[in-house]
From Swiss-Prot:
<feature type="binding site">
    <location>
        <position position="126"/>
    </location>
    <ligand>
        <name>Zn(2+)</name>
    </ligand>
</feature>
<comment type="similarity">
    <text>Belongs to the Cu-Zn superoxide dismutase family.</text>
</comment>
<dbReference type="InterPro" id="IPR036423">
    <property type="entry name" value="SOD-like_Cu/Zn_dom_sf"/>
</dbReference>
<comment type="subunit">
    <text>Homotetramer.</text>
</comment>
<keyword id="KW-0560">Oxidoreductase</keyword>
<protein>
    <recommendedName>
        <fullName>Superoxide dismutase [Cu-Zn], chloroplastic</fullName>
        <ecNumber>1.15.1.1</ecNumber>
    </recommendedName>
</protein>
<keyword id="KW-0479">Metal-binding</keyword>
<feature type="disulfide bond">
    <location>
        <begin position="119"/>
        <end position="193"/>
    </location>
</feature>
<dbReference type="GO" id="GO:0009507">
    <property type="term" value="C:chloroplast"/>
</dbReference>
<feature type="binding site">
    <location>
        <position position="129"/>
    </location>
    <ligand>
        <name>Zn(2+)</name>
    </ligand>
</feature>
<dbReference type="GO" id="GO:0004784">
    <property type="term" value="F:superoxide dismutase activity"/>
</dbReference>
<keyword id="KW-0809">Transit peptide</keyword>
<dbReference type="InterPro" id="IPR018152">
    <property type="entry name" value="SOD_Cu/Zn_BS"/>
</dbReference>
<keyword id="KW-0150">Chloroplast</keyword>
<keyword id="KW-0862">Zinc</keyword>
<dbReference type="InterPro" id="IPR001424">
    <property type="entry name" value="SOD_Cu_Zn_dom"/>
</dbReference>
<keyword id="KW-1015">Disulfide bond</keyword>
Length: 201
């Protein structure tokens, strides 16, 4: 849809002629239409905001599932993860939250401050480290946990647009003594991932 702006001198030099803002184009209006009304723009008011996000987790492996995130009134997030294996099962997997680019650098992780612990139960930790999840005999892993990361897309610790990643090995929580313990938790390769996006409540 296009729009034109009508402009005129004040007072009108000719009561029957107004010109548009486009050069070389003019429109003629009858005298009874020569008085134009204006209105002020009003700021947009947001009356509701989504407080639910979803990430569908898939990859080159046989691991797939979904993660649903809810934001409560205290601005914490409750995450529900459900993962399934089409064959076999895995006892431990490790989940982290990273930016969408699927690189292997530990710099991908959300780092609110530089710390060397990965346990999701530790008071001071990497904000994107979600710890280990356990699959049952049917190969299904489910977990529920909460942590203080916001949905607000303009904040540096927002989950929107970031990715949830399932790794192939048990995370040693930065305490395993391996050369990769403090960077990736020595959690191995990435089995599945999905980008977090907002969804209607």
């Amino acid at each position: 849809m296009a729009s034109q702006t009508l402009v005129s001198p004040s007072p009108l030099s000719s009561p029957s002629l107004l010109r548009t803002s486009f050069s070389g184009v003019s429109v003629k209006l009858a005298p009874q239409f020569s008085t134009l009304a204006t209105s002020n723009f009003k700021p947009l008011t947001v009356v509701a905001a989504a407080k639910k996000a979803v990430a569908v987790l898939k990859g080159q492996s046989r691991v797939e599932g979904s993660s649903t995130l809810h934001q409560d009134e205290r601005q914490q997030q409750l995450m529900f993860v459900s993962l399934a294996y089409t064959q076999g099962f895995m006892v431990f997997t490790y989940m982290s939250m990273v930016i969408p680019q699927m690189g292997v650098s530990q710099q991908d992780h959300i780092l609110i401050q530089q710390v060397d612990t990965w346990c999701s139960e530790d008071e001071i930790r990497h904000a994107g480290d979600l710890g280990n999840i356990v699959a049952n005999a049917e190969g299904v892993a489910e977990c529920r946990q909460s942590w203080q990361i916001r949905y607000h897309s303009l904040r540096p610790n927002s989950v929107v647009g970031r990715a949830l990643v399932v790794h192939e090995l048990q995370d040693d929580l930065g305490k395993g003594g391996h050369e990769l313990s403090l960077s990736t938790g020595n959690a191995g390769g990435r089995l599945a991932c999905g980008v977090v996006g907002l969804t209607p409540v």
